[in-house]
Design a protein with these regions (language model features):
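Structural helix C-cap motif within protein kinase domains
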Residues: 110-113
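Activation segment
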Residues: 60-62
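Activation segment signature within eukaryotic-like protein kinase domains
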Residues: 19-20
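Protein kinase catalytic-loop region centered on the HRD/HxD motif
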Residues: 25-35
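Conserved end of the kinase activation segment
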Residues: 85-95
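A conserved short helix/loop substructure at the end of the activation segment
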Residues: 152-159
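AlphaC helix of the protein kinase catalytic domain
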Residues: 1-11
Length: 159
């Protein structure tokens, strides 16, 4: 998907919806089997010839023993990492994949991740402050913006 984004630069809302829906279904499948991917990003989403997404690179994935289990491993890709992983206080669970899905959604619409910065520490600070905006020069519907805002909530229980 990252190669396709480089060619396209941004996706239409219809295409973004098409791909995001597939990511959500794949994440639902994983979570139903108590698997957290923990590194969802465009570079780990692969398209087949029918434009069907397959999730790859399960190197950071973990299988929980029970649904309420929480993990404390710090892992993921800086632009996509959830704030609760950075904070590390109460651990993390399925909600980190939801956060990353929101970052993917934004990235498809805008062409770059919402918290992208000049260096990793600045990116982490922006994530923890939930500091991002939609470019004013882009026409993005209020529905798409609202969905993104609902997913990219710092408090994981609000996602």
């Amino acid at each position: 998907m990252s190669k396709l984004l480089k060619c396209e630069q941004t996706f239409s809302e219809a295409d973004t919806r098409f791909y995001t829906q597939q990511v959500v279904e794949a994440v639902r499948y994983l979570h139903g089997r108590l698997i957290i991917h923990r590194d969802l990003k465009l570079g780990n989403l692969f398209l087949n010839s029918n434009k069907v997404i397959k999730i790859g690179d399960f190197g950071f994935a973990t299988k929980l023993a029970y649904p309420d289990e929480r993990r404390k491993t710090i892992c993921g890709t800086p632009n996509y990492i959830a704030p609760e992983i950075l904070e590390g206080k109460n651990g993390h669970s399925f909600e980190v994949d939801i956060w990353s899905t929101g970052v993917i959604l934004y990235t498809l619409l805008v062409g770059k991740p919402p918290f992208q910065s000049k260096d990793v520490m600045s990116t982490y600070k922006l994530i923890l402050m939930n500091s991002y905006d939609f470019p004013t020069e882009m026409t993005i519907s209020s529905d798409a913006k609202n969905l993104t805002h609902k997913i990219l909530q710092v408090l994981y229980n609000k996602r």
